[in-house]
């Protein structure tokens, strides 16, 4: 997963974000269309999306609330990473850190997306799914992102596979936000390629989850050893 420099990025987008064209207000439309492509084709180009947010900073009359929320949702799918916060910091203070009296639709949306992202970054996966299901607004905010829930599940599974050799089935089911054992088993076996044995999910050994014996070695040269002996002799004298 490379959300910073994806292979799907076309040359004309690369020319915009790497050249002076990134300051041209007319480039906003091109970058917006490219964001739509990302949402439909399930890839993410955070670099290009930040270029669009920077254009919005310079040209506030061009701001589109739906584009901002789509950028944040796409950045969220890159967890754990700083991508969401990097995008958030390009919004105005009233949007990214609204006060208690803020009531605009965008500030409310940003606040809710921040909460979701914090739960993913904190590995509070079961809580994330509960929050996502708690308000219809979340469905509205993610509706443009094709396969959003599946992308989150796959990413959670990748992180689990890097950390565990086995995990309790009910725990993983809650982390994946799946509500029945049949769907969970299908995801585990077909998408992840793991095995279910009773209430335990067996995860194959890989470079990340393999237990390694820690080897601690200290090289002590003759001079260091001599100083220790001398100090011990002086203290006992």
Curated annotation (Swiss-Prot):
Keywords: Cytoplasm, Initiation factor, Protein biosynthesis. Transmembrane segments: none annotated. It is found in: Cytoplasm. One of its GO terms (molecular function) is RNA binding. GO terms for cellular component: eukaryotic 43S preinitiation complex; eukaryotic 48S preinitiation complex; eukaryotic translation initiation factor 3 complex. Belongs to the eIF-3 subunit K family. This is Eukaryotic translation initiation factor 3 subunit K. It comes from Neurospora crassa (strain ATCC 24698 / 74-OR23-1A / CBS 708.71 / DSM 1257 / FGSC 987).
């Amino acid at each position: 997963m490379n959300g910073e420099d994806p292979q799907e990025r076309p040359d004309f987008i690369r020319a915009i974000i790497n050249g002076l064209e990134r300051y041209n207000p007319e480039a906003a439309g091109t970058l917006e269309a490219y964001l739509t492509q990302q949402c439909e084709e399930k890839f993410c180009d955070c670099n290009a999306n930040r270029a669009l947010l920077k254009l919005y900073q310079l040209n506030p009359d061009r701001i589109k609330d739906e584009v901002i929320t789509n950028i944040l949702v796409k950045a969220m799918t890159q967890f754990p990473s700083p991508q969401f916060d990097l995008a958030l910091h390009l919004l105005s203070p009233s949007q990214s850190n609204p006060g208690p009296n803020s009531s605009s639709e965008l500030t409310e949306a940003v606040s809710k997306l921040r909460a979701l992202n914090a739960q993913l970054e904190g590995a509070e996966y079961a809580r994330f799914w509960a929050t996502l299901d708690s308000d219809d607004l979340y469905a509205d905010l993610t509706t443009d992102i094709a396969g959003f829930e599946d992308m989150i599940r796959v990413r959670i599974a990748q992180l689990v596979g890097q950390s565990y050799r086995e995990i309790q089935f009910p725990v993983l089911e809650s982390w994946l936000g799946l509500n029945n054992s049949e769907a969970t088993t299908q995801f585990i076996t077909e998408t992840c390629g793991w095995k279910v044995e009773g209430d335990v999910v067996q995860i194959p050994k890989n470079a990340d989850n393999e237990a390694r014996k820690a080897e601690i070695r200290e090289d002590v040269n003759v001079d260091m050893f001599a100083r220790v002996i001398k100090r011990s002799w002086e203290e006992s004298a």
